[in-house]
């Protein structure tokens, strides 16, 4: 279920503050965040945001196609290591 239209999109205030500071600065740096739940706004386009996946911060370069999605959608939290090998196949 999607978010109510009357509520509008959500983004953490501390992330918005960091984005505004970054756009005012001449030199672009990576913005570190733990806020996977924040919606990507058009003002984020062109910035690199390092999103926490539970182990490390993974850098995500924001493009126009990402606007409206959540930051956490672009950083998987689980590592798939493969299924167990079949013992019958080895014999």
Curated annotation (Swiss-Prot):
GO terms for cellular component: cytoplasm; small ribosomal subunit. SUPFAM superfamilies: Ribosomal protein S19. The keyword RNA-binding applies. It comes from the Bacteria. Keywords: Ribonucleoprotein, Ribosomal protein, RNA-binding, rRNA-binding. NCBIfam families: rpsS_bact. Protein S19 forms a complex with S13 that binds strongly to the 16S ribosomal RNA. HAMAP family: Ribosomal_uS19 (MF_00531). Belongs to the universal ribosomal protein uS19 family. This is Small ribosomal subunit protein uS19. The gene is rpsS.
């Amino acid at each position: 279920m999607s978010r109510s239209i009357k509520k509008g999109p959500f983004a953490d205030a501390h992330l918005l503050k960091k984005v505004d500071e970054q756009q005012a600065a001449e030199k672009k740096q990576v913005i570190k965040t733990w806020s996977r739940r924040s919606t990507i706004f058009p003002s984020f386009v062109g910035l690199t945001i390092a999103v926490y996946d539970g182990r490390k911060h993974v850098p995500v370069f924001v493009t126009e196609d990402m606007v409206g999605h959540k930051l956490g959608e672009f950083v998987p939290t689980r590592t798939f290591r493969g299924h167990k090998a079949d013992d019958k196949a080895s014999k």
